[in-house]
Amino acid sequence: MVTVGSFLSPDEAERLRVFERQRHDTLATSYHDFFTAVTTRAIDPLLRAVCAESDFKLLDVATGPGSLAAEAARRGVRCTGVDLSSGMIQLARKSNPGIDFRVADVEHLPFADGSFDAVVCNFGLGHFPYPEAAVAECIRTLRKGGRVAFSWWSDPSKQRIQGLFREAIAEVGAAPPPDIPVGHSVYRFADTGEFTRLLEGAGLVEACVENHQTEHPIPDLETLWRGGLGSLALTASAIGHQNAATQTAIRAALKRRAQAYRPSAGYILPMAFKIGAGEKP
């Protein structure tokens, strides 16, 4: 699978932003159809991590189709959602017309200092060109004493939806496609130490990282295959640029590896993620 470097030049960072924006514009609907059911597993832990209460002002960064913002609103929280992808924001607005959704870059949030009681980001961290800058900007918009929380994936050996695709691509030896940018490793924050250092380095107090593990059912291989291609930006690009024979080989490798998680008719895939949180002093 594609691994990207740890440090980006400004040109590489912009290339990554363009890739992420364009890919998620394209994948917005198919992402929602398949992957929202996966990412919503982290919503309740995130809201608990920031002690979200009724009438809190909450910022949801990398809101995607707006699922976390919608759940927060159901709990009486006043939520604003932002995302780099206009396609995702259009989908979020359509699904949740009563919530304020805006297109915005996490490194340049259009809010005054201390605007929010809490900030959350559900599986956005590994998509940002400069995670340290993104976290700092989130904290800037947070009031003193407010809390911020980020979710990100655990190692692919534990997070098997992405892990199975990653391993199948590597097994076949598929060459990285030219449109995948050089960037940071998407699994940098699968390491608890790296995640903790990110939070502490941003000046947060009581920073902690917790592990969460669950399972996700998928009825058949076709759903897994189409879901991955329709939801995972790097995976979709990596596979989409291969010739037909290589794509067939990747699918065969995926099927063989997924058999370990097929107790009966469908698949039960382990999924694991981390919640990193802290308080603004």
Q: Across the structure, where does each feature detected by a protein language model lie?
A:
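A short SAM/SAH-binding and catalytic strip from SAM-dependent methyltransferases
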Residues: 118-132, 154
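Conserved catalytic/acceptor-binding region of the Class I
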Residues: 132, 140-219, 243
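Conserved class I S-adenosyl-L-methionine
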Residues: 2-56, 67-71, 88-91, 95
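Conserved Class I S-adenosyl-L-methionine
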Residues: 9-13, 65-67, 185-281
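A structural alpha-helix within SAM-dependent methyltransferase catalytic domains
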Residues: 47, 70-73, 132-139, 166
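Class I SAM-dependent methyltransferase SAM/SAH-binding core
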Residues: 57-109, 118, 133
